[in-house]
Amino acid sequence: MASASPVATMSGRGARNLLQFLRLVGQLKRVPRTGWVYRNVQKPESVSDHMYRMAVMALVTKDEHLNKDRCVRLALVHDMAECIVGDIAPADNVPREEKHRREEEAMKQLTQLLPEDLQKELYELWEEYETQSSAEAKFVKQLDQCEMILQASEYEDLENKPGRLQDFYDSTAGKFSHPEIVQLVSELEAERNANIAGAASEPCS
């Protein structure tokens, strides 16, 4: 019987760098999603919360034409730079080119802490998402928007204020094309519209 391949080990410096990388990525658990902060949502989700559910959404896709593993990886990496630059929202009025420049620098800084093969893998995943250069990147971009309006709906439910976060829905109008996501969004909007209509029909106290 052939013996198992030995597990690769790292140098002390490599371990220290990996620990620093993990601590930086851990900051994502403490970076709130800026859009919710600006709308005075109580206890807003973190960037990490958002990316986790996106990764789960990618994991459960039924589209066999997509590389599911790559979709999950893209979801986990796409906002990783925000552990350094923060969540730059449209309301911040930072030009797209400047936002990209900051995030590109952050990704280079972050991935330099990893072995060369992982540096390349993570940076290229981020770049693929940024440039929307694959079917998987386009799908994950739509997951990003879908997860956002799902979260908006949940905040409206938690606050018992149906329709309060309509601007998040407006910002995604016409942006969904993948059949699976279109169906999911349609169901979400039907439920939300029913909640709004129900609230409107309730007598004022």
Curated annotation (Swiss-Prot):
Gene3D superfamilies: Hypothetical protein af1432. It catalyses: a 2'-deoxyribonucleoside 5'-phosphate + H2O = a 2'-deoxyribonucleoside + phosphate. It holds the Pfam family HD_3. The lineage of its organism: Eukaryota, Metazoa, Chordata, Craniata, Vertebrata. A divalent metal cation 2 binds at E82, D87, I88. GO terms for molecular function: 5'-deoxynucleotidase activity; metal ion binding. It comes from Bos taurus (Bovine). A divalent metal cation 1 binds at H50, H78, D79, D144. Homodimer. Binds 2 divalent metal cations. Shows activity with Mn(2+), Co(2+) and Mg(2+) but shows no activity with Zn(2+). Its EC number is 3.1.3.89. Belongs to the HDDC2 family. Signal peptide: none annotated. This is 5'-deoxynucleotidase HDDC2.
